[in-house]
Amino acid sequence: MSKLGDYAAVKKDILAVLKQPEYDDGSAGPVLVRLAWHASGTYCARTDTGGSNGAGMRYEAEGGDPANAGLQHARVFLEPIKEKHSWITYADLWTLAGVVAIEAMGGPSIQWKPGRTDFADDSRLPPRGRLPDGAQGADHLRFIFNRMGFNDQEIVALSGAHNLGRCHSDRSGFEGPWVNSPTRFSNQYYKLLLKLKWQPKKWDGPFQYVAKAPGADDDDEQLMMLPTDYALIQDEKMRPWVEKYAEDRDAFFNDFAKVFAKLIELGVYRDESGIARADKMKQFKGEYKSAPQKSPVPGAPGAGKDGEANPLARQNERAHGQAQHALAKL
């Protein structure tokens, strides 16, 4: 066991678990980034609930959310580290692992602060349905990310995390990698999004786009893009950022480092010593419905058609109002 606060020792052990020959593309890195992302991406600025504090995925209500399918692998990879360094909280370990993995895979150095606490029970968990649904369009992206406090530029920058990893049909329903080198952080995601001729995938699964990788043989695995990825180049306000990041790797790395650091601080309330206070976090009270789920039919509700989330946005407005009214009485 390391000394209390010896984060260098924790980082060293995180680096040691990244190589996983039997796992996706031989690396645990991408799934650790996804764990940090999903642990943080439940934040709602309107109700001031959710976020990276608490490590709620330890409980079924959050860990069993279909949007978090497959993240049990990331948690299993990190469990020996938690056992060895028992003083670190899960909330800190999960976010630190994402930051360490990004840099180890060639990405930028990202600011990370310790001090998050773990929930003692599941009473403060955010509702399901707050994470992005890859089958949607630009309106859904804004609905989800604006709720957390992100603008269009930050949405496009955070989408660059799709430089890493792959989709699995038994988890998200989608299948395939976004880029040629899914364990190397780069701006290739944006370049391929603009360069390749993306076509609807012919299969029985949810609607997604596929294209032949540059230099690939006909029988090689195809690259893929989600409807939310393709929406970035269809939307007139988001596309310029895709073009900028495709052209300027350094600009992307710089912006990604800033926005990922912002993401993993969402919902963290620190006292003067820097320790996050779980007792300052608010409980969500009220109903929250998720956006439409995946559809195999292009253009159908749930397949990425603009405007589809508007009715659900109105429902959530009412839910937010109810939640704020309840919180005002606390």
UniProtKB/Swiss-Prot annotation:
A GO BP annotation: response to reactive oxygen species
Q: Which domain of life is it from?
A: Eukaryota
Q: Which GO terms describe its molecular function?
A: heme binding; metal ion binding; peroxidase activity
Q: What class of enzyme is it?
A: oxidoreductase
Keywords, sorted A to Z: Heme, Iron, Metal-binding, Oxidoreductase, Peroxidase
Region: Disordered, residue numbers:
286-330
Q: What is its EC number?
A: 1.11.1.-
Name the chain's protein: Putative heme-binding peroxidase
Q: Which gene encodes it?
A: CCP2
